């Protein structure tokens, strides 16, 4: 039988009234008696302080202060102490007979807050002979002693062999030691546990039914179901781990995304700016060099332009000087051409007028003849008209008196008479008396012939007259011609002068015929002269251009020399062109190759970066694609091996997890079906009965029961026989044992215990030998021990699994990286460095550019020489054909000579032109000038006579014709005879009148017509004369004007003048064109010089600015490079692929990254400030500072517990691996979190049943307790209705609420709380969260309602309330409940410490006088039966015959207050013994 631990004594050092007092405590009841202020409460306060040294709980109040909250500032402890060091120590001996002294050192703290400093300590291994007061006091003399400080106490104990001194910094450690050594009944892990313990002590101290205890009986009596709690805790822990894992995944993802985002954007932001500055620095250097080259080139160009400007200005001056003379010559030539054209027009007019005059003269002569003939005819017609008029008048007068009306006969008679009259007239006129009408026709022919002859004679005379008249006119005309040519002269001199003029005209005509040959000869000579002058000008210009004077004889040799030079230069230019083409072709090929390499360089650089990363990750150097593929095969093999090992570790880990899960089942049931069967059969699992077996006994009981250790203990086997029929859902071997689950023991077997084994005699003929298992799992302690070892193993396996998973992930990522590299970069990674090739090609390109520049200069010079030689040859080609002209020195004299001859010929031509017609007219008639015509008058008379004869012959012929016409009238003789004489006469007169009127009409008509014709002829003659005179005057004027012009107007004059003018115009135009070209070229040259000057100034300014910028940038760049190298970020920032992007692209890249960074670090004030500072474009080093700050920030964010690197870039990869591991871990854990609501309900219900049974067992111990009218005390335990409904729903209707338990957003606790709220909507949950409510619902104690009931008198069982009980009954009832609580605590704590320790049991009772003797006796009996120590305080001795009684009296001696203590043991069975440290009542001891 294990002895219960006891408190041996209480020691007070330097308390108020107690300097060094030790109270030996009785094994049952210790009574402190004394009056008011004797020190009873102080003694109990010292005990409680040593037991619970928590200033937040201690509150020592008087009974009169009950309910007061502010009666004492120090809660009663400060005033119970003396100044200086104070101690309160408890001397105990536990079940193992170990002496343990625990206590506290107290000391008042100076100040108005009246604080107390408490230091708990413990002493082990102290010999029994050493008293506690000897430890903490030092005797100075017989009456004086000194209290040792805690440090002195420690030093003192250190000197004692085997004694251990422990000082505690926390109350939890202090209580943990007291629990382990069996001083207190419960492990006080927290302030809540200490509060419960203190409230228990306080309730026992002041007595009665404590409301604090009553309200929380569940917490005091119902132990925490560690199995259920642990299961739920494991589940919740797993859920929390899931949440933590999810949070870790989220954080890792966030960190990874943050790292990726920050590194990516910061790298883009800074690297783009870094590379842009690097590119700009290179560009600025190139620009500075280009500016310098362009500056030198521009200076050379300016000097060349200045020389060119001087040459062109000089040439322009020469052309300006020549232009004036050329303009004057051109104006003179134009004027001369105009004069020639005017003279030619005058000459053409003169010739046209002369031709017109000749034609007019001919027409005038003809018209004179026509007018003369018309005048003669007019005279004849006038005469005939007069005769006819006379005849009519005469006939009219004769017929004035005749009849006016005649008949036909009269008419015929008249016609006859007229015919006779006509015949008579014909006879008269023809002098033919014998003329008859019949012979009239013959005579008519005769007289017509005579008329014809007369007419011919007239015509002959007329011709003669005309000839004579012509001869007369020819003389006059010839005379006029001579006078016109020679001027006025005598008619007698006309013949001599005419001959002289004709002879001179022949000579002049001969000279005039030489005008055209002479003119052509002169034109030819003048052309040659002009060519000679042009040749001289060309020669002078050639010499000027060549800068040397050449003789004519040297030109041919110079021409040959220039031809040879042209040939050589042409070959050079041709070869230079080919060479330039080859150089340019090579340059284009180089440029194309460079462009191709520049396009390929970023790809190659990316491949190299990837290859370098692979090399860094695997620690290998690769030089060929074959090595990469071989290493990839090695990676595959390594990955396969790592996966195999990981799977093995994972399988073992899963097995451990399954075993842990199996061992963690409530009641030790490894098979869940056993719990259901036990509940079905109304039994209890054997493992649950032995659940509290110790770890040392576990192997024995495991071997004892063997395979039946998983049996079900049932009250009666016969009652379950029927239930076994048809049972299928059970293990293969189901063991059933009959027995009482509440009082089951191992007496069912006959057992012989051997060494580490047992022999179980199952029957007479069946034994079972079972060895003690090396790893027992029978009992909670064994299972927990096994679970603990499995957890340790699982930790090792988990760490190994995590390491292997990490390695596998790393290998897989490395394999993926190699695969990506092979797919993307393998084809280019091992090619030659394109940048090195670009540098080589750039060097070659520079050489080619230099060669091209040199070649261009040489070619330009050769072209210039070639052009000069070509110009020289061209000039010589124009000069060489004119060398004979240049050598002809007499050409100008011959031109003058021919010009004189031409002038003479032109004078003769002008004479011939002026008088040639007169001479031509004079030459045929010059002979008429020898004599004047004399018979012109005789011819006129003969012509008049002949004209009269012709007129007479015409009249005769007319008369005969009339007779012939009237021959028919001669037959009207009878009509004439019939008429009287008057009638015949009238008839005849009428006939004659008619004839006369007809003749008169004919004469008038002829006269009118001839008069009109004569008038017309006269008008034509007058107009001809007028026109002739006018043109004659105009001709004279034109000849005078032609003479006034003074220009030869020959046929070639205009052509020569025009040719001369055109030549001069061409020269002038050429001169002007050249001058304009020179002016434009000069203007352009000046503008070019001005542009070059401005360009030079700008280039000098730009060059100096660029040079200053380069120098400044170099200093800043050096600082940037120093900062980059010092911080080791050059590899991150010097991204060579960015060197191939333009500045705009890099700036855009940097700006985009800047915008992303502003959003990414908006919550980080430090990085935000650094980023804001880095935006200054003039301070590029601040961007490096920002990049370093980002890296430093990321390094600080790296979780060193999971990431083994300081490099954020490498941390990203490890984060990826960690994410994969966490995801796998989360997946595996989620698969193990399946817990059903039915299981939860069964566990809670079974736990409730077990605890109800335990409470019933506790009630059995209280049935015999009675106080006053209270006959019995019991605890009533019921399940709350709302919670019972919850359990029913969880067990039977969980399918209706799977929306809660299957939700990924809710934990099981939260789902349980939601279900409780759903089932009980009327209950107000307050401000508590679903998680808090759910955790409460997972605790079975919250399902129970507990209340204390008493069987009092005739009232029967009723709720124990202070108002319904007397004071003594209430104190007794409360004490009974407290004893039950302590016993419950001991049962709960038994599994937490060894079974060989039974803890101390001690309660307090102040003011015990309120109990009667029977109640006191009941307490004594209860203490004896429960082996409980009790300290009672009472004013008087209530039961001195039992236990130990101390009499306390407070006295004052010499201003010193002390308590006089007298101890007395119970005297009922034997005489009291004097206790150590006390005296008998007769000899009281005093302490000072």
From Swiss-Prot:
It is found in: Cytoplasm, Nucleoid. GO terms for biological process: cell division; chromosome condensation; chromosome segregation; DNA replication. Residues 326-413, 444-472, 509-602, 835-923, 977-1116, 1209-1265 form a coiled coil. GO terms for molecular function: ATP binding; DNA binding. ATP binds at residues 34-41. InterPro entries: MukB, MukB/SMC, MukB_hinge, MukB_hinge_sf, MukB_N_dom, P-loop_NTPase. Keywords: ATP-binding, Cell cycle, Cell division, Chromosome partition, Coiled coil, Cytoplasm, DNA condensation, DNA-binding, Nucleotide-binding. It comes from the Bacteria. Belongs to the SMC family. MukB subfamily. The hinge domain, which separates the large intramolecular coiled coil regions, allows the homodimerization, forming a V-shaped homodimer. Homodimerization via its hinge domain. Binds to DNA via its C-terminal region. Interacts, and probably forms a ternary complex, with MukE and MukF via its C-terminal region. The complex formation is stimulated by calcium or magnesium. Interacts with tubulin-related protein FtsZ. This is Chromosome partition protein MukB. It comes from Salmonella paratyphi C (strain RKS4594).
């Amino acid at each position: 039988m294990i002895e219960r631990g006891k408190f041996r004594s209480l020691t007070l050092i330097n308390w108020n009234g107690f300097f060094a007092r030790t109270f030996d405590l009785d094994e049952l009841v210790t009574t402190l008696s004394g009056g008011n202020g004797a020190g009873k409460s102080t003694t109990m306060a010292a005990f409680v302080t040593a037991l619970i040294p928590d200033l937040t709980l201690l509150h020592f109040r008087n009974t009169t202060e009950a309910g007061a909250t502010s009666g004492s500032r120090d809660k009663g402890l400060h005033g119970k102490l003396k100044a200086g060091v104070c101690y309160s120590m408890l001397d105990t001996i536990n079940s193992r007979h170990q002496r343990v002294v625990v206590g506290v050192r107290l000391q008042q703290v100076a100040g108005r807050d009246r604080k107390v400093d408490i230091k708990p300590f413990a002493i082990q291994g102290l010999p029994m002979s050493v008293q506690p007061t000897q430890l903490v006091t030092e005797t100075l003399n017989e009456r004086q002693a000194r209290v040792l400080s805690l440090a002195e106490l420690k030093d003192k104990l250190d000197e004692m062999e085997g004694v251990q001194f422990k000082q505690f910094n926390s109350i939890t450690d202090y209580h943990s030691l007291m629990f382990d050594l069996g001083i207190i009944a419960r492990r006080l892990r927290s302030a809540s546990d200490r509060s419960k313990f203190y409230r228990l002590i306080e309730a026992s101290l002041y007595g009665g039914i404590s409301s604090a205890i009553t309200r929380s009986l569940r917490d005091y009596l119902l132990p925490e179901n560690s199995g259920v709690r642990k299961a739920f805790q494991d589940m919740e822990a797993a859920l929390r781990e899931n949440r933590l894992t999810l949070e870790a995944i989220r954080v890792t993802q966030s960190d990874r995304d943050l790292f990726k985002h920050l590194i990516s954007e910061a790298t883009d932001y800074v690297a783009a700016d870094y590379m842009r500055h690097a590119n700009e620095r290179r560009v600025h250097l190139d620009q500075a060099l280009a500016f310098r080259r362009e500056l030198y080139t521009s200076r050379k160009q300016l000097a060349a332009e200045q020389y060119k400007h001087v040459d062109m200005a000089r040439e322009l001056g020469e052309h300006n000087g020549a232009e004036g003379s050329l303009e004057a010559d051109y104006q003179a030539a134009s004027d001369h051409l105009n004069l020639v054209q005017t003279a030619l027009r005058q000459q053409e007019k003169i010739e046209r007028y002369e031709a017109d005059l000749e034609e007019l003269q001919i027409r005038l002569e003809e018209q004179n003849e026509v007018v003369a003939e018309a005048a003669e005819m007019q005279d004849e017609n006038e005469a005939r008209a007069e005769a006819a008029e006379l005849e009519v008048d005469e006939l009219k007068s004769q017929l004035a008196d005749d009849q006016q009306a005649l008949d036909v006969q009269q008419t015929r008679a008249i016609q006859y008479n007229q015919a006779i009259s006509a015949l008579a007239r014909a006879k008269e006129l023809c002098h033919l008396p014998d003329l008859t009408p019949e012979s009239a026709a013959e005579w008519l022919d005769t007289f017509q012939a005579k008329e014809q002859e007369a007419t011919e004679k007239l015509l002959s005379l007329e011709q003669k007259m005309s000839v004579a008249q012509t001869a007369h006119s020819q003389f006059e005309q010839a005379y006029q011609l001579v006078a016109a040519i020679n001027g006025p002269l005598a008619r007698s001199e006309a013949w001599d002068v005419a001959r002289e003029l004709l002879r001179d005209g022949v000579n002049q005509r001969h000279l005039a015929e030489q005008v055209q040959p002479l003119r052509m000869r002169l034109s030819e000579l003048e052309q040659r002269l002009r060519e000679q002058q042009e040749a001289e000008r060309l020669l002078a210009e050639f010499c000027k251009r060549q800068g040397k004077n050449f003789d004519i004889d040297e030109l041919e040799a110079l021409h040959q020399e220039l031809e040879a030079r042209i040939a050589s230069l042409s070959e050079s230019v041709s070869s230079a062109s080919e060479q330039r083409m080859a150089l340019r072709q090579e340059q284009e090929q180089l440029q194309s190759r460079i462009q191709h390499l520049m396009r390929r360089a970023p790809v190659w650089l990316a491949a190299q970066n990837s290859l370098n990363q692979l090399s860094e990750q695997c620690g290998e150097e690769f030089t060929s694609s074959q090595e990469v593929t071989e290493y990839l095969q090695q990676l595959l093999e390594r990955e396969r091996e790592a996966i195999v090992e990981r799977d093995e570790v994972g399988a073992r880990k899963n097995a451990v997890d399954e075993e842990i899960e199996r061992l963690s089942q409530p009641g030790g049931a490894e098979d869940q079906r056993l719990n259901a069967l036990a509940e079905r059969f109304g039994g209890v699992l054997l493992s649950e009965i032995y659940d509290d077996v110790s770890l040392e006994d576990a192997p024995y009981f495991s071997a004892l029961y063997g395979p039946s250790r998983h049996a079900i203990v049932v009250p009666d086997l016969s009652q379950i026989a029927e239930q076994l029929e048809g049972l299928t859902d059970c293990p293969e071997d189901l063991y059933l044992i009959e027995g009482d689950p509440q009082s089951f023991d191992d007496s069912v077997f006959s057992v012989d215990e051997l060494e580490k084994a047992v022999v179980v005699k199952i029957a007479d003929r069946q034994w079972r030998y079972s060895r003690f298992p090396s790893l027992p799992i029978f009992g909670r302690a064994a299972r927990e021990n096994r679970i603990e070892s499995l957890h340790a193993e699982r930790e090792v396996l988990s760490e190994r699994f995590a390491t292997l998973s990490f390695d596998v992930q790393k290998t897989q990522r490395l394999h993926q990286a190699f695969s990506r590299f092979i797919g993307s970069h393998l084809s280019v990674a091992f090619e030659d460095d394109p940048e090195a090739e670009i540098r080589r090609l750039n060097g070659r390109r520079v050489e080619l550019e230099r060669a091209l520049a040199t070649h261009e200069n040489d070619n330009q010079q050769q072209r210039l020489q070639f052009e000069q030689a070509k110009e020289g040859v061209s000039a010589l080609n124009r000069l060489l054909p004119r060398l004979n002209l240049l050598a002809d020195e007499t050409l100008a004299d011959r031109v003058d000579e021919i010009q004189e001859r031409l002038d003479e010929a032109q004078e003769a031509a002008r004479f011939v032109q002026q008088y040639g017609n007169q001479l031509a007219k004079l030459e045929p008639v010059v002979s008429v000038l020898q004599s004047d015509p004399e018979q012109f008058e005789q011819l006129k008379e003969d012509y008049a006579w002949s004209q009269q004869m012709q007129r007479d012959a015409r009249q005769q012929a007319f008369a005969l014709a009339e007779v012939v016409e009237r021959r028919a009238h001669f037959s009207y003789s009878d009509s004439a005879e019939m008429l009287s004489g008057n009638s015949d006469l009238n008839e005849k007169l009428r006939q004659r009148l008619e004839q006369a009127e007809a003749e008169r009409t004919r004469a008038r008509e002829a006269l009118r017509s001839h008069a009109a014709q004569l008038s017309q002829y006269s008008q034509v003659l007058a107009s001809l004369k007028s026109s002739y005179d006018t043109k004659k005057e105009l001709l004279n004027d034109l000849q005078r004007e032609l003479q006034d012009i003074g220009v030869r107007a020959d046929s070639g004059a205009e052509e020569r003048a025009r040719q001369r003018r055109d030549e001069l115009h061409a020269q002038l135009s050429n001169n002007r064109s050249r001058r304009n070209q020179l002016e434009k070229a000069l203007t352009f040259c000046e503008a070019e010089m001005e542009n070059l000057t401005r360009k030079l100034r700008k280039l000098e300014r730009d060059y100096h600015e660029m040079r200053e910028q380069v120098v400044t940038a170099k200093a800043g760049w050096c600082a940037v490079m120093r900062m980059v190298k010092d911080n080791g970020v050059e590899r991150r920032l010097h991204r060579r692929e960015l060197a191939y992007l333009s500045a705009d692209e890099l700036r855009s890249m940097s700006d985009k990254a800047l915008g992303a960074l502003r959003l990414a670090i908006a919550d980080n004030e430090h990085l935000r400030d650094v980023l804001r500072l880095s935006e200054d474009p003039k301070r590029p080093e601040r961007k490096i500072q920002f990049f370093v700050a980002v890296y430093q920030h990321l390094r600080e964010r790296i979780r060193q517990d999971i990431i083994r690197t300081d490099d954020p870039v490498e941390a990203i990869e490890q984060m990826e691996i960690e994410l994969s591991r966490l995801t796998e871990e989360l997946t595996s854990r989620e698969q193990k979190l399946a817990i059903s609501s039915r299981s939860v309900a069964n566990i809670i219900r079974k736990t409730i049943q077990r605890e109800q049974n335990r409470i019933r067992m506790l009630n059995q111990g209280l049935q015999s307790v009675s106080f006053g009218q209270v006959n019995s005390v019991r605890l009533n335990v019921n399940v709350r209705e709302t919670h019972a409904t919850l359990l029913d729903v969880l067990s039977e209707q969980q399918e209706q609420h799977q929306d809660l338990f299957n939700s990924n957003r809710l934990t099981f606790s939260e789902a349980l709380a939601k279900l409780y709220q759903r089932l009980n909507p009327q209950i107000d949950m307050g401000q508590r969260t679903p998680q808090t409510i759910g955790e409460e619902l997972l605790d079975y104690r919250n399902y129970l309602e507990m209340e204390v009931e008493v069987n009092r008198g005739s009232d029967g069982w009723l709720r124990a309330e202070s108002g319904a009980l007397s004071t003594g009954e209430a104190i007794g009832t409360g004490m009974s409940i407290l004893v039950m609580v302590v016993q419950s605590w001991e049962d709960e704590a038994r599994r937490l410490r060894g079974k060989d320790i039974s803890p101390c049991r001690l309660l307090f009772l102040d003011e015990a006088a309120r109990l009667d003797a029977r109640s006191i006796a009941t307490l004594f009996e209860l203490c004896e039966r429960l082996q409980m120590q009790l300290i009672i305080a009472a004013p008087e001795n209530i039961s001195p015959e039992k236990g130990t009684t101390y009499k306390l009296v407070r006295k004052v001696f010499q201003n010193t207050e002390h308590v006089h203590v007298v101890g007395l043991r119970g005297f009922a069975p034997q005489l009291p013994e004097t206790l150590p440290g006390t005296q008998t009542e007769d000899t009281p001891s005093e302490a000072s």
